[in-house]
Amino acid sequence: MKKVDVKESAVGRETRIRKQWNEQSIFEQSIQNREGAQSFVFYEGPPTANGLPHVGHALGRTIKDVVARYKTMAGYKVLRKAGWDTHGLPVELGVEKQLGISGKHEIEEYGIEPFIKKCKESVFTYEKQWREFTESIGYWVDMDDPYVTLENPYIESVWHILGTIHEKGLLYKGHRVSPYCPSCQTSLSSHEVAQGYKTVKDLSATVKFKVKDSENEYFLGWTTTPWTLPANVALAVHPNMEYVKAKQEGHVYIVAKERVQDVLKENYEVLSVHKGEELLNISYTAPFPMKEVTNGYRVIGADFVTADSGTGLVHIAPAYGEDDYRVVQSEGLSFLHVVDEKGEYTEAVPFLKGKFVKDCDVDIVRYLAKEGLLYHKEKYEHSYPHCWRCDSPLLYYAGESWLIRTTAIKDTFLQNNDSVTWYPDHMKHGRFGKFLENMVDWNISRNRYWGTPLNVWECESCDHQFAPKSIDDLRKHSTKETQEDLELHKPYVDEVQVCCEKCGGTMTRTPEVIDVWFDSGSMPFAQYHYPFENKELFEEQFPADVIAEGIDQTRGWFYSLLAVSALYTGKVPYKRVLSLGHVLDEEGQKMSKSKGNALDPVDLVNQFGADALRWALLVDSAPWNAKRFSERTVLEAKSKFVDTLVNVYSFYVLYANLDEYNPNETYDVKRTKLDEWVLSRLHSTTKKVRIALDDYQFTNAAREIAALVDEVSNWYVRRSRNRFWESGMNAEKAAAYETLHDVLVTISKLIAPFTPFVAEDIHLNLTGSSVHLEDYPVVNESLLQPKLEAEMNAVLQVVELGRSNRNQHSLKVKQPLAELVLLEHNENDMDWESYRDIVMDELNVKAFHVELDETKYTSYQLKLNFKTAGPKFGKNVNAVNGWLKQLSQDEVQNFVSTERAVYEVASGEEIVVTTEDVLVEKVAKSGFSNTTNGQYTVMLDTNVTEELLQEGVAREFIRAVQEYRKQLNLPVNLRVDVILDTEEELQQTLTNHKELLEENLLVKQFTFGHLTNEDDELSLGETKVRIKLSATK
């Protein structure tokens, strides 16, 4: 075995391992070795390569890698195809910035074709960084053969899917109000909108709409979007709701009866009550009368009106509200548009023409006030949608769009979702399920340039539509011969014209591109160019057994995958969804570069290693929980887990090499109870880890492994050191080597999916083979000893209590004590005699015994809890307090046992005192200190005799010399002669414990003599010792 370089950095070790993987094609071998095995399918959600990875990507890649590695080691064939999401607005915006242009007008001036070429060039700007990040974090995914959404085969599959949807009559062109980004100048789908809500404070206004032909009567309407008022065409009331006419300061106001107090506040008089239906068709004067409104400015009925907020009357602007649009359509009222595609007012609002509408709320309110039409204004905090790409506030804007009739197959969506297992479970019928319940038709078109062209050609003569499902299909219907290598992007496909089958007219392509979420939602099919090729491979790889991405994909990729599959095949595309929580900073705030609190995962890997980063992301909390994260989190993972394991591994290699131990040879072995215990712990942990991983409970599995590694290091190895230090090779020493070898090899397999680099380093050195080509460990039931584990757990509890006791009373473990008494509070069949030597050695005591009668060593003190007793006992509280203080120890013991006592006051009244009224404190017998955990109480004799004190000094000297040997980098098996120069009292103490010193320090000869200032000096408290070591001849 190669010597372990404990000074090698984590990133140095991981770089070395990566090189070995690449040279030996270990990733490829891990898949090839499972050829013919059952497939386990997972899909890679495609990232965009025109932005850099963040810590959230590290979590996602870690989880996906853990699943894929575990399932591979569990016997499955796991294909891992990478993917790139290459279309969409982010790419366009990046190119605009690069070119120094902005907006559609400037893009078209620059030229569509050169702009598209620039987009194509820019999409892989950071591919190298993504590849390096992916490899450095240990995520095994095939990046040499990825699916890429901009490539013709991928687009052709998307066309086949959308063409099929059109064929089913589910794709239609409609005029409707959609969420619209004025900055990007395109509409968005409902699931995109759901990703970008922000809490904002907007100016709200309660507006006076004067009843026509009245002197002082007004409808009051409340709006949080004053900018929409110039487009008002109606007011809506609920026909079945009650409204009042109320007089205030000479004006009569009409509001909902339930809202009158909140709106008018005070000094008003209700004149009459009316049903909403009585108000229908009453005309009013609009705040911004428009001549285009030939049918409007009257009250209409709508069932979406409520009295939950506002005035109970809704101002209707059909161009900027979905409900508004529907009700105006049904009423046959006029339609009014006063805002252009840039979100700026048109000449219809002359005094605000050219201004961005969201910046004009104050101007509108000032105008209303000037005209005497403002009743009230205030800032209103509410949730408002923003563009998930550019962060601009959205408008609801009427226009033509291509939509998919998802509502027509809503039941299929819901049924498919019911068959999916969600992690966490509440997502299924909560956030995701509710989104499906409230779905609207999918706005699939985008008025942009860089994307999959929407494959619908429309006839200029008869409005017939043609939706080709393949390139060949398009070629067959083209009016001219198309080039062989036709690129399926604008402007190239726009040049293809089709002959109308219906009337013989010319058909041109509708100019829009497809929503990028449709691109990524098509990946189960398009990644294999289905249905044009790879049908068998597709069928093998559909549906996914699991997908895993961030929670923000609930209304993104998780939805688009489900939607595309339901629309295309009717089937569910995945069996399980792992919805990962946000990675926050240590204050619980979302990380962002603008805030300066973002952590770069590449920097974390370089500083602490990928294993530490992965472990930190897994062990802290379940991955679906939002987690606070910092450099300190990763440092702790490195020091507490990775470094601890490396130290155990290094210890084993060091001594096995010294003793020339060969695990492939046969030795006479005699396993101790400690060996049997650690093997039982190893296999019971394996059992728990497999159960956890099969249920995707990564954190539970990681914590089980962490506990095992800690016990192996801080209990098994520490308790076994003397066996390794012995000279020669006896049966117990051989058993220690064999056991630790088996433990380390099995642990390397257990951790391989979690921390693949250190796992590989250990396994490769101990066995000569890659751990990632091994099977995952299975439980050896014959090695399980639950009773032994329970007993050793009890020993560990007692030892921990003993250490805590020493710490609380400033008694160093090196200082021997006379006695430990263990008080057991519950009788059991624990054989403490078998563990006597372990407890005595661990806690450095000369005697140990178990006592069931705790009254021999402890007593109780009762103190009145005035916080609860004061109100309960009132004037008798002081009397009760005095009575408690004079109770005998037997009476106190009886109270503790029964948890109640009765005190009779002078008047003869009986007062019942319970444990709620009293603070019970356990007090140790004089000369003893106690620590308890409820099940056990450890009593330590704290009287330190002179003899014990001297032995404590000798043990401190041993510790100091051992540290000194480390500083000198002396081989651990080197025997030395020691010369000491110190005061006479210490000389005597060390002489008296010569045998103890020689046994623990590999010293052949101790002598005392005069040393010079050139020799080294050790400190034992305030005492100085000069020391000189020389190798034994």
UniProtKB/Swiss-Prot annotation:
InterPro entries per the record? aa-tRNA-synth_I_CS (IPR001412), aa-tRNA-synth_Ia (IPR002300), Anticodon_Ile_ABEc (IPR033709), Ile-tRNA-ligase (IPR002301), Ile-tRNA-ligase_type2 (IPR023586), M/V/L/I-tRNA-synth_anticd-bd (IPR013155), Rossmann-like_a/b/a_fold (IPR014729), tRNAsynth_Ia_anticodon-bd (IPR009080)
Chain ranges for the short sequence motif 'HIGH' region as given in the UniProt record: 47-57
* Location of the motif 'KMSKS' region: 590-594
State the family named in the UniProt similarity comment for this chain. Belongs to the class-I aminoacyl-tRNA synthetase family. IleS type 2 subfamily.
Its quaternary structure?
Monomer.
Q: What is known of its domains?
A: IleRS has two distinct active sites: one for aminoacylation and one for editing. The misactivated valine is translocated from the active site to the editing site, which sterically excludes the correctly activated isoleucine. The single editing site contains two valyl binding pockets, one specific for each substrate (Val-AMP or Val-tRNA(Ile)).
Q: What is this protein called?
A: Isoleucine--tRNA ligase 2
